[in-house]
């Protein structure tokens, strides 16, 4: 079993959802970002999504756009992001780590080279937000052939006819974007989330993670009662933006992660 399968199976036995945390690689700088990454599992993160900085993150809201700018201004590259995963893996062989971003940097890096290096450094899966199923041959199929999970996004506008196409070839988990729009947007109603999870379960046995708009332990707990995973990104990244310095940013992100984890773990 993959690390993602193992983690979700373990949490299912514990009757709780996973806390899935998103941070951008290299934000606010390489050293602080690595410190955050290494600290997330102990703070309560069950799965980590690590953003690959890109100059045009069109699916992301202001918080993550600014995180991309901070990271790129600090010299973060795809090669440095892969190196960061390598350094993380030297001390953690159990926490699933997924790279999330856009196809352009991967294409420029070289798809074969990227897949080989991602697998070698210990990446478990990929979320590539601008690559629809019609382009599975470009990255999804080669990545899965190498043993990487390929996680698809579904949204409130993904209809029942489209869902099987989106889910075909998905692995690891399904990421349901509970608000149509950019990351960090307003949260969806719990009734809407419950209906969406029920609809997705009719189409897939994969774990379902819910993201976009989750900012507090209370909200995380409410979503954790309905889904297999609770994805939080913008709220964590806001802590970096608002911190007085990088050392404070590390503390603040890990503190919020701890609060969210407590909410998720006490939800059921």
UniProtKB/Swiss-Prot annotation:
Enzyme class: lyase
Entry keyword Nucleotide-binding: no
Substrates-to-products reaction catalysed: (1S,2R)-1-C-(indol-3-yl)glycerol 3-phosphate + L-serine = D-glyceraldehyde 3-phosphate + L-tryptophan + H2O
Pfam family, one: Trp_syntA
UniProt-annotated catalytic positions: 49 (proton acceptor), 60 (proton acceptor)
Listed GO CC annotations: cytosol
A GO term for molecular function: tryptophan synthase activity
Pathway: Amino-acid biosynthesis; L-tryptophan biosynthesis; L-tryptophan from chorismate: step 5/5
Organism superkingdom: Bacteria
Gene3D superfamilies linked: Aldolase class I (3.20.20.70)
Residue runs in coiled coils: none
Keywords: Amino-acid biosynthesis, Aromatic amino acid biosynthesis, Lyase, Tryptophan biosynthesis
EC number: 4.2.1.20
Biological role stated in the UniProt entry: The alpha subunit is responsible for the aldol cleavage of indoleglycerol phosphate to indole and glyceraldehyde 3-phosphate.
Quaternary structure and interacting proteins, as annotated: Tetramer of two alpha and two beta chains.
Family label: Belongs to the TrpA family.
Protein name in UniProt: Tryptophan synthase alpha chain
Organism: Pseudomonas aeruginosa (strain UCBPP-PA14)
Taxonomic placement: Bacteria, Pseudomonadati, Pseudomonadota, Gammaproteobacteria, Pseudomonadales
């Amino acid at each position: 079993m993959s690390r993602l399968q193992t983690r979700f199976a373990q949490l299912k036995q514990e009757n709780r959802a996973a806390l899935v945390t998103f941070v951008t690689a290299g934000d606010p700088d390489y050293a602080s970002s690595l410190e955050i990454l290494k600290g997330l599992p102990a703070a309560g993160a069950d799965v980590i999504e690590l953003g690959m900085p890109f100059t045009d993150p069109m699916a992301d809201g202001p918080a993550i756009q600014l995180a991309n700018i901070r990271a790129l201004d600090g010299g973060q590259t795809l090669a440095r992001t892969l190196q960061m995963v390598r350094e993380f893996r030297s001390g953690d062989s159990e926490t699933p780590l997924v790279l999330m971003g856009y196809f352009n940097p991967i294409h420029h890096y070289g798809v074969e080279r990227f897949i080989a290096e991602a697998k070698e450094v210990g990446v478990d899966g990929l979320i590539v937000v601008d690559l629809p199923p019609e382009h599975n041959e470009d990255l999804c199929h080669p990545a899965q052939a190498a043993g990487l999970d390929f996680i698809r996004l579904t949204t409130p506008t993904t209809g029942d006819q489209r869902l099987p196409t989106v889910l075909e070839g998905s692995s690891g988990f399904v990421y349901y974007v509970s608000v149509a729009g950019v990351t960090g947007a307003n949260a969806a109603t719990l009734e809407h989330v419950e209906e969406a999870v029920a609809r997705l379960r009719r189409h897939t046995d994969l774990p379902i993670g819910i993201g976009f708009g989750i900012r507090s332990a209370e909200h995380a707990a409410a979503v954790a009662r309905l889904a297999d995973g609770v994805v939080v990104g913008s709220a964590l990244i806001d802590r970096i933006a608002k911190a007085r310095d990088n050392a404070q940013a590390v503390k603040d992100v890990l503190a919020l992660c701890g609060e969210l984890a407590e909410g998720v773990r006490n939800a059921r």
